[in-house]
């Protein structure tokens, strides 16, 4: 099993010999793209109610400043630049557009502010990406589904948030897994924003317009 997502760029890190000239306690910005599903809410809760107090107790953290862009790339870019201008020492992002933020990441890097993507990835050589292999995860889901229906049948693929690295990689993996079974036909794709209520509504709409 390849542990690296084939869509994630790999190269020598720009931070290999980098050292910050800033001393703790640090102020960290979290430029969140979305908080409308259970996973994102859980990640926010853990960051603010578990990690933040522990870091503060250790004397490493002053505060975490949170922004929300609600899946608007232009707004997230603006918020990243504003966080840099406000004097944060580092920025966290999550499940972002893989290319749209690259100039904002460079803006931060040029001013001594590292940007960390803690799940998903960007294509900027100036960000630090920490991510699982979403393509492999999707492939495993696709092959499992194909085997569950006996290698034959019509499949509706419900993906996450199109245009965002983790979602796109996972969706590509699902389709790759399903494609290994000639008897499987992908009859449609819908997006559910990784939110169960949206998934139910979108599935019902699709079924209503595709009877039989």
Q: What is the predicted function of each stretch?
A:
Residues 1-212:
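A residue-level marker of the well-folded mature domains of exported/periplasmic proteins
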């Amino acid at each position: 099993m390849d542990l690296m997502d084939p869509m994630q760029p790999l190269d020598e890190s720009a931070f290999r010999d980098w050292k910050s000239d800033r001393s703790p306690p640090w102020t960290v910005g979290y430029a969140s793209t979305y908080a409308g599903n259970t996973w994102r809410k859980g990640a926010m809760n853990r960051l603010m109610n578990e990690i933040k107090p522990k870091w503060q107790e250790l004397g490493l953290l002053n505060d975490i400043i949170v922004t929300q862009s609600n899946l608007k790339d232009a707004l997230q870019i603006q918020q990243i630049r504003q966080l840099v201008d406000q004097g944060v020492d580092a920025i966290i992002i999550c499940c972002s557009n893989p290319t749209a933020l690259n100039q904002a990441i460079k803006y931060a890097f040029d001013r001594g502010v590292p940007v960390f993507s803690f799940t998903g990835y960007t294509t900027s050589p100036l960000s630090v990406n920490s991510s699982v292999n979403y393509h492999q995860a999707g492939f495993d889901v696709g092959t499992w589904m194909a085997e569950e229906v006996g290698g034959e049948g019509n499949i509706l693929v419900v993906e996450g948030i199109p245009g965002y690295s983790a979602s796109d990689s996972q969706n590509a993996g699902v389709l790759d897994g399903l494609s290994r079974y000639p008897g499987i036909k992908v009859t449609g794709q819908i997006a559910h924003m990784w939110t169960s209520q949206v998934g139910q509504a979108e599935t019902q709409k699709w079924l209503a317009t595709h009877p039989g």
